[in-house]
Amino acid sequence: FSKSEIVKYYHVNPEKITVVYNAWQHMQRVRPDPMLFGEYSKWPQLKKGEYYFSMSNLLKNKNFPWVLRAAQSKPQVMFAIAGGGSLAKEAAALGLDHLNNVMYLGYVTDGEAKSLMENCKAFLFPTLYEGFGIPPLEAIACGAPRVMVSNTPCMREIYGSHADYIDLSTNHGSVDHVTPGRDAAAVLQKYSWEGSARRMLE
């Protein structure tokens, strides 16, 4: 996808472009935070397997409002959103700051992110535009039971049939209306930092 965009907008000879993908093995070195769901949890409202998790910021391509609308449609389930920027202020500007089932976690450590990914109900990534989109791959590597991504050319290229797809043209905020994928963990076999390094050296 990124290669085709470069060719389209910068008129570069496609034969001069080599695609080298991101990977996920760095998450193997991260130790999940053991205290996150313990007796003295930082976020006691979050229960294992009972919350949706997303990582966002105020960049429009991240489609933060979609997550809020999804939370609005499921008031009985918690939605945890990690990331920088004044997300709460943006929610207020959208008139969606009244949602009691949304938690703004701010910046999280790698250990916290891993723990949040492996214990969530599903990881949400409703992006409008990406060059790769590594967070869903990290979530799969961490053991997230479901990963929901937007049905865009980039996401289709990276995740194939191994993710649940959100059709943003018709789905304006629902985690229930998605096209299910299969065997998400199988996508991990496609990407490795070692393979990417070899390709760079070539």
Give a label for each model feature.
Residues 1-202:
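Carbohydrate transferase catalytic cores enriched for Leloir-type hexosyltransferases
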